[in-house]
Swiss-Prot record:
This is Interferon alpha-4. PANTHER family: INTERFERON ALPHA-10-RELATED, TYPE I INTERFERON. GO terms for molecular function: cytokine activity; type I interferon receptor binding. GO terms for cellular component: extracellular region; extracellular space. GO terms for biological process: adaptive immune response; B cell activation involved in immune response; cellular response to virus; defense response to virus; humoral immune response; natural killer cell activation involved in immune response; response to exogenous dsRNA; response to virus. Residues 1-23 form the signal peptide.
Length: 189
């Protein structure tokens, strides 16, 4: 067991170093993954959103954190990473597993996981290039609070199918904002 864990860690470190040494072209690699995630999320819809209009909720998406004009690239990547991490966490719960068709949920989670790996490699590279703090704490906190509100909503609604549908639509909206941030980053390069 200890040997296999050590081997796994060695492979992970080597692959991480090779990813980082290739350079970070986040806007191209990440935006394709983001589009695939959006398509999968759209396919996951099980019920008509019209039947859930009474359950709509304003989660207070932190749009200003995805403006992109005030960020250096490393900070913007850190915000994107936090959003994808929180989305991954939300859809990795047991309650989420019961709400969605399993194969689509697995594909969606795999796509998010790949994006996290890409973003982590880019964060490491960009911090080294720009020598800026790893992340903008206020922005990261705003994203975390946003996801806390989503989780609280699901809990209050007892993870009902309509609650999950509202959350699915909200996550699609937030992923769209991240796509727009990526476009702005591409223009800055």
């Amino acid at each position: 067991m200890a040997l296999s864990f050590s081997l796994l860690m060695a492979v992970l470190v080597l692959s991480y170093k090779s990813i980082c040494s290739l350079g970070c072209d986040l806007p191209q690699t990440h935006s394709l993954g983001n589009r695939r995630a959006l398509i999968l999320l759209a396919q996951m819809g099980r019920i008509s959103h019209f039947s859930c209009l009474k359950d709509r909720h304003d989660f207070g998406f932190p749009e200003e954190e995805f403006d992109g004009h005030q960020f250096q690239k490393a900070q913007a990547i850190s915000v994107l990473h936090e959003m994808i991490q929180q989305t991954f966490n939300l859809f990795s719960t047991e309650d989420s597993s019961a709400a969605w068709e399993q194969s689509l949920l697995e594909k969606f989670s795999t796509e998010l996981y790949q994006q996290l790996n890409d973003l982590e490699a880019c964060v490491i590279q960009e911090v080294g290039v720009e020598e800026t703090p790893l992340m903008n704490e206020d922005s990261i906190l705003a994203v975390r609070k946003y996801f806390q509100r989503i989780t609280l909503y699901l809990t209050e609604k007892k993870y009902s199918p309509c609650a999950w549908e509202v959350v699915r639509a909200e996550i699609m909206r937030s992923l769209s904002f991240s796509t727009n941030l990526q476009k702005r980053l591409r223009r800055k390069d």
